[in-house]
């Protein structure tokens, strides 16, 4: 009989076998900081217009080529619990503002890196946290003073276009003027009088071929589908939408039939035909000339639809059906009954068109007062179009933010350097040990212009010293000139490089909260993972014998 081996005394004694336990500065805090630094370093090189792309292949073997931090993090599936906190902060930024996710990561990474220096010098964690929280509060007090201008008229396409340049530029440098104009046209055309803008009302349809500059905006909806029948174009369309198949009702009983004569064979399907004819005629008599269905279309129903000159469109996606109902003002009917006038939708024209070599059905409103607008994107590869779609998404979200708060702050690192300068001065006036943390908080802001400079290929230290010198003279709006080949600065307000006030406000708040949360952790206790061994993923033939 084997002897009972006692567990080592201490915390591990209380836990189940296989559980892991880390505590103290070395094991918990520094480890967490290291993980967050690594994550921030990964996305830092993707920051700004000259940021590098990342090639990510997810667990479904889908390829992503992008410099959008939100997409990179979503597909990376980060496992480390501390790094996950930073990822969650960037997801919150994505939900709140729709842009600035990389700012949160880079800034939180810089805060933790500088906190590690202070902890190694002998400051306690609570002093660092207190200093960071005071500095964050001070940054939010200073930020309103840095506002350089406000959006005046959100119904002017040219003004809106100029305000969207910066957010689009970070994803599609070189195409920002063209894309910002498209996004502005789409947003302004459906901006309601109430001022409540819904980002879901801007749809994107990606069609392979041609180039980015062949993209266009359309008031209405575009579907990559073909029409089912012979009718391919209808003006002044009255639309009936059905969520059921466009077919006759079939009973669930067995259909065994005994036919004794040729006449009976002739009359066999006549009743079914007459019923289908009556159903389609009843729909046509209501004035409906376009039928959209969410199910299959029977051959017989198609024949009668052609007979009564009804255009038939089949949409497999229930989401597409819902959006179409919203666009044309229709109600989706669950059964093949003739619609009443209130249930029918209206559209100026519905037609089949060919874009490149792709057939599309277009539901078009001539007036710019539709509920939904569609941006038709063209591009040479699917990955490129996906990246352009992300740029469009950022632009639309920026417009949404401007409808909530019209204030703008200078971009290109100008706001960050001014905050760093003023918070450093404030830190000098604080008597306690938290002054060191406040100064480090200010220093963390330098990570943003430093990342922009490094990604543009110029010397970061030279740029930052130039920016400090200019800001010391009182030029608050001067930031990094990313187009210059040598370290240079210029006025961001004149250059039109502007960031939203809300975007900056939330990014600073969320990054600080995430960094403080990571620093507050002094113990990590991990239970043994449940279940047996997981099968190896990726190998399709993992259970077959290997012939080496």
From Swiss-Prot:
Disordered as annotated region, ranges: 529-548
**What name appears for this protein in its UniProt entry?**
T-complex protein 1 subunit theta
Q: Which residues cross the membrane?
A: none
Here the disulfide bonds are: none
Q: Which family does it belong to?
A: Belongs to the TCP-1 chaperonin family.
Glycyl lysine isopeptide (Lys-Gly) (interchain with G-Cter in SUMO1) crosslink residues: 459
Q: Which residues bind ATP?
A: 100-102, 170-171, 412, 499, 504
Q: What class of enzyme is it?
A: hydrolase
Summarizing the function annotation, the protein's role is: Component of the chaperonin-containing T-complex (TRiC), a molecular chaperone complex that assists the folding of actin, tubulin and other proteins upon ATP hydrolysis. The TRiC complex mediates the folding of WRAP53/TCAB1, thereby regulating telomere maintenance. As part of the TRiC complex may play a role in the assembly of BBSome, a complex involved in ciliogenesis regulating transports vesicles to the cilia.
Q: What Enzyme Commission number(s) apply to this enzyme? A: 3.6.1.-
Q: Which domain of life is it from?
A: Eukaryota
Its keywords, alphabetically, are: Acetylation, ATP-binding, Cell projection, Chaperone, Cilium, Cytoplasm, Cytoskeleton, Hydrolase, Isopeptide bond, Magnesium, Metal-binding, Nucleotide-binding, Phosphoprotein, Ubl conjugation
Query: Which Gene3D superfamilies does this chain map to?
Result: GroEL, GroEL-like equatorial domain, TCP-1-like chaperonin intermediate domain
Q: Where does ADP bind?
A: 47-48, 100-103, 169-171, 412, 499
Could you confirm whether the keyword Hydrolase appears in this record?
yes
Q: Known Pfam families for this protein?
A: Cpn60_TCP1
Complexes and interactors: Component of the chaperonin-containing T-complex (TRiC), a hexadecamer composed of two identical back-to-back stacked rings enclosing a protein folding chamber. Each ring is made up of eight different subunits: TCP1/CCT1, CCT2, CCT3, CCT4, CCT5, CCT6A/CCT6, CCT7, CCT8. Interacts with PACRG. Interacts with DNAAF4. Interacts with synaptic plasticity regulator PANTS.
- Report the locations given in the UniProt record: Cytoplasm; Cytoplasm, Cytoskeleton, Microtubule organizing center, Centrosome; Cytoplasm, Cytoskeleton, Cilium basal body
In terms of InterPro entries, this protein maps to: Chap_CCT_theta (IPR012721), Chaperone_TCP-1 (IPR017998), Chaperonin_TCP-1_CS (IPR002194), Cpn60/GroEL/TCP-1 (IPR002423), GroEL-like_apical_dom_sf (IPR027409), GROEL-like_equatorial_sf (IPR027413), TCP-1-like_intermed_sf (IPR027410)
Gene Ontology cellular-component annotations: centrosome; chaperonin-containing T-complex; cilium
Q: Write out the catalysed reaction.
A: ATP + H2O = ADP + phosphate + H(+)
Which PROSITE patterns does UniProt cross-reference here? TCP1_1, TCP1_2, TCP1_3
Glycyl lysine isopeptide (Lys-Gly) (interchain with G-Cter in SUMO2), cross-linked positions:
224, 254, 260, 534, 539
Lineage per the UniProt record: Eukaryota, Metazoa, Chordata, Craniata, Vertebrata
A molecular function annotated in GO for this UniProt entry is: ATP binding
The record lists Mg(2+) as bound by 99
């Amino acid at each position: 009989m084997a002897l009972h081996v006692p567990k080592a005394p201490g915390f591990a004694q209380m836990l189940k076998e296989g559980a892991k336990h880390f505590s103290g500065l070395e094991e918990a805090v520094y480890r967490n900081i290291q993980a967050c630094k690594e994550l921030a370093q990964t996305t830092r090189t993707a920051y700004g217009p000259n940021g590098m792309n990342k090639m990510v292949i997810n667990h479904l073997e889908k390829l992503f080529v992008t410099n959008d931090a939100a997409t990179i993090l979503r597909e990376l599936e980060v496992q480390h619990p501390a790094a996950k906190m930073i990822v969650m902060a960037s997801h919150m930024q994505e939900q709140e503002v729709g842009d600035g996710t990389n700012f949160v990561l880079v800034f939180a990474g810089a805060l933790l890196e500088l906190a590690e220096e202070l902890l190694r010098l002998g400051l306690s964690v609570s002093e660092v946290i207190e200093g960071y929280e005071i500095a964050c509060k001070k940054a939010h007090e200073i930020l309103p003073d840095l506002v350089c201008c406000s959006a005046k008229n959100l119904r002017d396409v040219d003004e809106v276009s100029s305000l969207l340049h910066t957010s689009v530029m970070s994803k599609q440098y070189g195409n920002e003027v063209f894309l910002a104009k498209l996004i502005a046209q789409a947003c302004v055309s459906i901006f309601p009088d109430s001022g409540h803008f819904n980002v879901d009302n801007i749809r994107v349809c990606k069609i392979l071929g041609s180039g980015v500059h062949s993209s266009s905006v359309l008031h209405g909806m575009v579907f990559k589908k073909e029409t089912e029948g012979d009718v391919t174009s209808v003006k002044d369309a009255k639309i009936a939408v059905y969520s059921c198949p466009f077919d006759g009702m079939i009973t669930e009983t067995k259909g065994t039939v005994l036919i004794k004569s040729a006449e009976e064979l002739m009359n066999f399907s006549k009743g079914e035909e007459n019923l289908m004819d009556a159903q389609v005629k009843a729909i046509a008599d209501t004035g409906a000339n376009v039928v959209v269905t969410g199910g299959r279309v029977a051959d017989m129903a198609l024949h009668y639809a052609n007979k009564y000159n009804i255009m038939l469109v089949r949409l497999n996606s229930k989401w597409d059906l819902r959006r179409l109902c919203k666009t044309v003002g229709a109600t989706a009917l669950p059964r093949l009954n003739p619609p009443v006038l209130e249930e029918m939708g209206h559209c100026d024209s519905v037609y089949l068109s060919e874009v490149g070599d792709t057939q599309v059905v277009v539901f078009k409103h001539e007036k710019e007062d539709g509920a939904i607008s569609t941006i038709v994107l063209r591009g040479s590869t699917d990955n490129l179009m996906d990246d352009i779609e992300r740029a469009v998404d950022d632009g639309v979200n920026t417009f949404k933010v401007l409808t909530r708060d019209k204030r703008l702050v200078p971009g290109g690192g100008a706001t960050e350097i001014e905050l760093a300068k003023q918070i450093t001065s404030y830190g000098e006036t604080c008597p306690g040990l938290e002054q060191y943390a406040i100064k480090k908080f200010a220093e963390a802001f330098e990570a943003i212009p430093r990342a922009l400079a490094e990604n543009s290929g110029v010397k970061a230290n030279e740029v930052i010293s130039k920016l400090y010198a200019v800001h010391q003279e009182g030029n608050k709006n001067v930031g990094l000139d990313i187009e210059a080949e040598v370290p240079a600065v210029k006025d961001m307000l004149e250059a039109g490089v502007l960031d939203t006030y809300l975007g900056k406000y939330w990014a600073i708040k969320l990054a600080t909260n995430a960094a403080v949360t990571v620093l507050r952790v002094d113990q990590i206790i991990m239970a043994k993972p449940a279940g047996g061994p997981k099968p190896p993923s990726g190998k399709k033939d993992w259970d077959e014998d290997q012939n080496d």
